[in-house]
Every structure is written in C-alpha cells, then in structure tokens.
UniProtKB/Swiss-Prot annotation:
Catalytic activity: ATP + H2O + a folded polypeptide = ADP + phosphate + an unfolded polypeptide
Compartments, as annotated in UniProt: Cytoplasm
Protein name: Chaperonin GroEL 1
One GO molecular-function entry: unfolded protein binding
Membership in a protein family: Belongs to the chaperonin (HSP60) family.
The organism's place on the tree of life at top rank: Bacteria
Subunit note: Forms a cylinder of 14 subunits composed of two heptameric rings stacked back-to-back. Interacts with the co-chaperonin GroES.
C-alpha cells in the first residue's frame, strides 16, 4: 500500500485541524447550559447526546492527516473516561487549547522538546494542587450533589447518592433500561468480580461493549476447560433449554473457547466465558461463594463431579449477567437469602479467627462482594432516543460520584482549574527558556473550560475568566451568578479534573513533537497513477 507523508509544520498543522474539528464538535456540550449534538446511526434513529466521549467516538474525518489529530484527541476522551468515567469534554477542550498554544510557540521557533517538558511539569503541578485543594466526600447529600452536577438532573443525582450510600464504597451500581417511563432504584443481591470476557466476540451490546445475558445459567468449573468433547454434552442440554450461559472457570481455551465463540457469532447459543478471579485456595473459595449466590454446584473432578457427566442440575441461575472487558456482574442469583446470610456469617467468623492482616483484607473483600449487593438504576423515558440520552447521563453521574468518593471534590465549572493556574506562576518563574514557555501554555489553557462554559451560557467567556481569576468566587453557569461553588453544590470530582489535565497534556506533547505524519494513499489516486504511467 503506497503511503503519503507530510513533514514539519505542515504535518503539525494538519493534526491541529483534526484536533480542532473534533474538539469544536464536543465543546458545545460543556457546562449546564451546553447544547446537544445529534449523531446519525447506520440503524435506527439518531442519538442525541451531550456526552463528550460518545460524540468523540463517533467522529472520523475524511482527510487522513486531520483524522490522525482527531484520533489523538479521541484517545484523551476515552482514556479520561476509562480512568474517571466523566470529564471527557473538559479533557478535549484542554487538549485543544494546549495543542493550539504549544504549536503557536513552536511555529515561532521554540524548541518542542523543551516546551513539552514544561507542559509535563505544569500538568504534574496542577494535579498536585488539585489534590491539595480537595474536600473529602461522604454522606448521601454530598454524593448526590456531585451526581446532580454531572447529570444536570436533581432526580438522577439523588438516586445515585442513595444507590452509592446503600451499597457502600466497594458496592456495585449498574444502569439498566427500564420497560416503564419511570426511572427507579432497585437494590438486589449480586456479585461483581474483576475478570472480563475471554473474547470480544461475546459482546452483545456494541454501544457499551458489554455482553449482557438475561435469565442465564451459570456454569462454575474448578479447573481449565479446553476439551470440546467434555463440554459438548452440557452445552447441548443448555441449548435445548434455550437459555444463555455464563461460564466461570480457571480458564477456557482451545477448541472449547472457539466453539463458544462460533456459537455466539451464529447466535445458536448465547454464551460468555470468563476466568475465575484470584489464585489457588482463594479462587476455589470464591467459586464456592458464587455457587451459593447462584444456587449452583462447582464442577470439581476431585469430588467426583466431572464436566462430561454434569447435567443441568449443577448450573446456577441469575436474572441478569453483565460482562465488560474488565469485570463481571451477576445480578439476582437464584441463591436464597438464608444461604447467602449463612455464607456471610461463616466469612465473618473466619475474619475474626485470622491473625494475618492480608488474609483479613482478602476475606473482607469477599464478604463485601457477597453481602454488599448491587444497586440497579432502571432508566425510563418516553422515546428510545430520550432513553439512550438519559442512560448516558446516569452512567456519567455514577462514575463521577464514585470518583468523588475516591479522591474528593473541588469547586466545579472550570473554576478549580483557573484557581490552580495561579499556582503555575511560581513554577514558570523558576524555569528558564522554552520550559517556562510550556508552563505558560498550560496556564493559559486551564482557562479554556471556564471560557467555554461561560460562552455556551451566552456570556463573554474572557470577562468571566478574568473575574474568577481575580477573586475567590466561582462562576455558576446554571444560575449565571458568582459565589462559593462548594456551598452551592457546583462541584467536580478531583479524579475527573486531574485525569483530564494529565491526559490532555500527554497528547499535546505528542502533537508538538511530531515531525512527520504517514498515512495510506487513497486507493483511487493510487490506481489513477498506475493507469497513466509516464504521461506528463
């Protein structure tokens, strides 16, 4: 395949155009008065959303060089979403401002490596300043405030606050679509563990990249499953019953895994295979926990139960199973409350009896998984489009609330970043040459989120930024007033804001230090040249 290459300033400017196109589409959604973006879908109606990462994921540009820039910023949004679950629009706006400011200086002759180094030092300093300024979050009301800001909806905020308070810090909150118009909170028995699907072919929902099984069987196996003849008899019985199955084993590999994948692709049997978490005795004990939760039996050759001879009776059951690339959640297992309570009591006795802190910690982790339960927020709306949009907002709110419990909160609405920018003056003055230029680029870029929040609310962004930079008060875009944002409940989780700054800085440095860009030559062009030979 022939390639096209651009060098130096031309390559960097093409990347910048791509960054700008994606960021301009995303930044209109920033703030409580941000607008919506409509995304056309290949199937079904359009998606209306104000979620940065959803918009970013949907954008591919025609010009291959510009597309490289767009993909780099997309990675900022995705990475921030993976770490903190929210703040994707802020990260995108910061990345755009950093790229723009950095390239302006590089074009004027600054050394890109030194500017990049200054940007990295400034990002670390901002990260530390935000952590130092954080206010810890505890209590339902404080969590609800964070979720309300993220989702722009008080009802959702209160629900998320209640959900997280009910299941605790280590508990699980999942978001489902409801068949009614109401959005409601249901706390059910459930377990989550940190292992995801063994093959992406098991995914059933391509939007969320999840495998979702409704009313499923659960097969628990003590050892590896690799032989197809061992697994086939049981698979046939499961297929006859017409239900999906979750397989949890030490590992599933070889022809057993490929058969499950082929059946999933052909839709003859809905199955998902995951590895059991932990190692050694802890893995065995956790499989026994799952057996209690799902009312199943662990297939264990040591006890005379082999996979080849196992019948439907060894399988556990669950109302719903959700598997992502990193974790598996089993909701409403068929185990009785008495059995689960007895198992939890046994774990508590073991916790009291153990002398080892490490064992105690691991047993408490198992107890939290077993007894913590799962809070399910069922999202309802009048139309499919409204339902999707609301579901995105609820998912963001849950992520933001969890992030707030982790690292605390700072004043929201871009104010914390403008306040952190004042801390960079000292750092800038302590550095010399182009490193100081890099710090100044970050200092200016930190004003961008507040600038666009104010602009989207119909005000002059520059005026609002200078007013917030002068005083102690922040800008509340929902009420168009200035005040103490922590008291008003306009707050952002530190984890979200920090991730946005660090990820944006990392991509900006990449763009600044790019000297050439290589892309595939479009097919038609290549063909045209081959036909015309040497004709000039």
């Amino acid at each position: 395949m022939a390639k096209q290459i651009e060098f130096d300033e031309k390559a960097r400017r093409a990347l910048e155009r791509g960054v700008d196109k994606l960021a301009d589409a995303v930044k209109v959604t920033l703030g409580p008065r941000g607008r919506h973006v409509v995304l056309a879908k290949a199937f079904g109606g359009p998606t209306v959303t104000n979620d940065g990462v959803t918009i970013a994921r949907d954008i591919d540009l025609e010009d291959p060089f510009e597309n490289l820039g767009a993909q780099l910023v997309k990675s900022v949004a995705t990475k921030t979403n993976d770490v903190a679950g929210d703040g994707t629009t802020t990260a995108t706006v910061l990345a755009q401002a950093l790229v723009r400011g950095g390239l302006k200086n590089v074009a004027a002759g600054a050394n890109p490596i030194a500017v990049g180094s200054g940007i990295a030092k400034a990002a670390d300093a901002v990260s530390e300043a935000l952590l130092a300024a954080a206010t810890p979050v505890s209590g339902e009301q404080a969590i609800a405030q964070v979720a309300t800001v993220s989702s722009r909806d008080e009802e959702i905020g209160e629900m998320v606050g209640k959900a997280l308070t009910t299941v605790g810090k280590d508990g699980v909150v999942t978001v489902e679509e409801s068949s009614t118009l109401q959005t409601e909170l249901v706390v059910t028995e459930g377990v989550q563990f940190d292992k995801g699907y063994l093959s992406p072919y098991f995914i059933t929902d391509t939007d969320t990249q999840e495998a979702v099984l409704e009313d499923a069987f659960v097969l628990l196996h003590r050892e590896k499953i690799s032989s197809l003849p061992d697994l086939l008899p049981l698979l046939e019985k499961i297929a006859e019953a017409g239900k999906p199955v979750l397989i949890v084993a030490e590992d599933v590999e070889g022809e057993a895994l490929s058969t499950l994948v082929v059946n999933s692709i052909r839709k003859t049997l809905k199955a998902v295979a995951v590895k059991a978490p932990f190692f050694g005795d802890r893995r065995k004990a956790f499989l026994d926990d799952l057996a209690v939760v799902t009312a199943g039996t662990v297939v264990n050759p040591d006890l005379g139960i082999t996979l080849r001879e196992a019948g439907i009776d060894v399988l556990g059951k669950a109302r719903r199973v959700v598997v992502t690339k990193d974790e598996t959640t089993i909701i409403d297992g068929a185990g009785t409350a008495e059995d689960i309570a007895a198992r939890a009591a046994q774990l508590r006795r073991e916790i009291e009896a153990t002398d080892s802190d490490w064992d105690r910690e691991k047993l408490e982790e198992r107890l939290a998984k077993l007894a913590g339960g799962v809070a399910v927020i069922k999202v309802g709306a009048a139309t499919e489009t409204a339902l999707k949009e609301r579901k995105y907002r609820v998912e963001d709110a849950v992520s933001a609330a969890k992030a707030a419990v982790d690292e605390g909160i700072v004043p929201g609405g871009g104010t914390a970043l403008v306040q952190a920018a004042t801390k960079l003056v000292e750092l800038r003055d302590s550095l010399s040459g182009d490193e100081a230029v890099g710090v100044e680029v970050v200092r200016k870029a930190l004003e961008a989120p507040l600038f666009w929040i104010a602009s989207n609310a119909g005000l002059d962004g520059a005026v609002v930024v200078s007013k917030v930079a002068e005083g102690k008060e922040g800008f509340n875009a929902a009420t168009l007033s200035y005040g103490d944002l922590l008291t008003d409940g306009v707050v952002d989780p530190v984890k979200v804001t920090r991730s946005a700054v660090v990820n944006a800085a990392s991509v900006a440095r990449m763009v600044l230090t790019t000297e050439s860009a290589v892309v595939d030559k479009p097919a038609e062009e290549a063909e045209d040249h081959s036909h015309h030979g040497h004709a000039h």
